[in-house]
Every structure is written in structure tokens, then in C-alpha cells.
Amino acid sequence: VVVRGEKKEALLKLFAAAFETVRPNLEKVFADKPKIVEGMKSFFQTYGGAPVFIVAYAGKSASGQWDTHSTAAALQNLLLAAYAEGLGGVWTDGILVKEPEINALLGIEEKKLVAVVPLGYPDEVPRVPPRRSGRVQWVGFE
């Protein structure tokens, strides 16, 4: 679902409320980095000023299972394609704690919310951090 305008603004209010739900966990994980928690709060309130949100849902497969893997693969491809076109986006799922409210706002029934991707042209492109050595171990193909 592509969301903009008034519904996007209503979603931002839900996202800000979602932050308060996830904040205790973030404060534990980043106990020594409070600026990260405050940065996340700011992001939840604005979603980077993106003009549109992609709200991704999974339906059920013929077997009755949620198609979350297919939705995840589609979102990853969307993010790669967006980057290739100069757009910025980020996969967010902290807002899943507000799924019932998001579904009600968008009129979605019988689908599972997977993620929300804010999408737009970035103000800047961050530098790619250097890779840490020793994080990948090759076992074969020698």
C-alpha cells in the first residue's frame, strides 16, 4: 500500500506512539548510547521526512501460511531498485506493535503487516562503513 497525504500524517502519529512502546527495549540495547535512542525517537516522529510510505502486507498462501517470506523478498528488491534510481528507503518494523491501529486506518483486513518503508530522495548519501574482518567464514568453494 502506498501512503501519502493525510493518511501518512495519521500514520506518523501512530509511529510516534509505537516508539514509546519499543523505547524500553531500545534503552536496554543502547544503554551506553542514549543519542541513538533519541535519534530513533526523532525518526519515529518524522520517518525522515519521506514523502511516501510503502506499507507492506503479506497475504495467506494456499496452505494457510502467511506469505511473509515472499513479501520480505519483494521489499528487499524494492529497496535495491529504489537505491539504483537514487531513492532512499529503510525497512522498519518497530511499528508492528501498532498493527491493529495501522490496519484500521488503512482499511486492511485479513493480512499481516510485515514492514513500513519510508521512500524519498535523501538529503545526503551516508558513507559506507568499512567492513569488519573475520565476520564471514568461507567453508567451501576453494
Q: What is each of the regions a protein language model found here?
A:
Residues 45-48, 105-110, 131-132:
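Solvent-exposed alpha-helices and their adjacent loops that cap or buttress functional pockets
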Residues 54, 59-105:
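Small-aliphatic-rich amphipathic alpha-helix that forms the alpha element of a beta-alpha
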Residues 112-142:
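C-terminal helix-cap and adjacent tail motif
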Residues 5-7, 59-61, 100, 121-124, ...:
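Short loop segments at secondary-structure junctions
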Residues 3, 93, 119-120:
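Conserved residues at the C-terminal ends of beta-strands
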Residues 38-42, 102-104, 125:
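Glycine-rich, charged/polar anion/phosphate-binding loops
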Residues 1-71:
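Glycine/small-residue-rich phosphate/adenosyl-binding loop
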Residues 48-52, 87, 110-113:
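Short coil/turn connectors at secondary-structure junctions
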